[in-house]
Amino acid sequence: MGQEMNSSALAGIRIADFSQYWAGPYAATLLSYMGAEVIKIESMKRYDWSRTQSLTTGLRYPGLEHSPVFAEVSANRLAVTLDLTKPEGVELAKRIVRVSDVVVQNFSPGVMDRLGLGYESLIEVKPDIIYLSSSAVGATGPEWNYRGYAPLFACQGGAAYITGYADERPYPMTGRIDILSAMTSAFAILAALSHRQRTGEGQHIDVSSAESIAVLIGDVLMDYIMNSRSQTRRGNRDDIMAPHNCYRCKGDDKWVSIAISTDEEWDAFTNAIGNPEWSEDRRFSDAYSR
């Protein structure tokens, strides 16, 4: 196992992980699966909130060491408990940073600065450190002081508005957005590591979770910018691909999911269901007609 880890892409990279819950920790977890060593830094006064999430253990409080959510999101780590409100705790944290390559944190903007562990403070300890800050809407701009978790920045980023059924309220997507933010952070850290390898320079990465959602709704944004159209929720239907939905079948709670993207697929589908003549029917001749 040791030999396998030593040959991993990020072998020799150490990450000081100050982050909590999902978007921050999972970014470090993804990098740990590539071989990086991750040290999770917590405080008993402000431990990772995901430790209290039960899910598969039932509705009861699972205890700080038994949360399946924490076990998944913050897997594959070393850990240390520090009181960052005391000078001794901050100094120990800086000693960890001094021997690390990356810092990951997802506190609200300004928190790490007040603790004495902001980017400007840590580059004095480790000049080439890669410092990733992840927050709801980033550390700059008119909304920088907005705090929030996935249900909030899923709405701010626009994904919630177009997700769900037309006759129902928007669906916030919750944990899926956290994972997307974590993937964005992990990718940014990999790019920063490559940059440092070539130039010797570290950098401060400011990730806005709301902006990271843009990759999901690029077509929606372009439609609004170019055509002034605001798309709405449409369930599992698609504007062009048809048929494209979940359809009820005979029997109790029986469904079939059909997604036809091309005319060739439509021809194959009509043959498969025993109605090849539908391919010749002008009402269904192309996706726009269907």
Residue locations for each model-derived region?
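Terminal low-complexity tails and localization/encapsulation signals of metabolic enzymes
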Residues: 1-14, 232, 246-250, 287
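N-terminal helix-loop segment corresponding to the beta1-alpha1 unit
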Residues: 1-188, 192-201
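Aromatic-enriched alpha-helical interface/lid elements that frame and gate functional surfaces
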Residues: 243-290
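Glycine-rich beta-alpha junction loops
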Residues: 45, 136-138, 209-214, 251-253, ...
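Short Gly/Pro-enriched turn/cap motifs at secondary-structure boundaries
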Residues: 62, 70, 231-239, 245-246, ...
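Mid-domain beta-loop-alpha active-site segment that forms a flexible
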Residues: 175-190, 209-217, 261, 265
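Oxidoreductase and adenylate-handling cofactor-binding alpha/beta cores
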Residues: 182-203, 215-227, 270-277, 281
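Conserved Rossmann-fold dehydrogenase catalytic segment
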Residues: 139, 166-174, 197-213, 232-239, ...
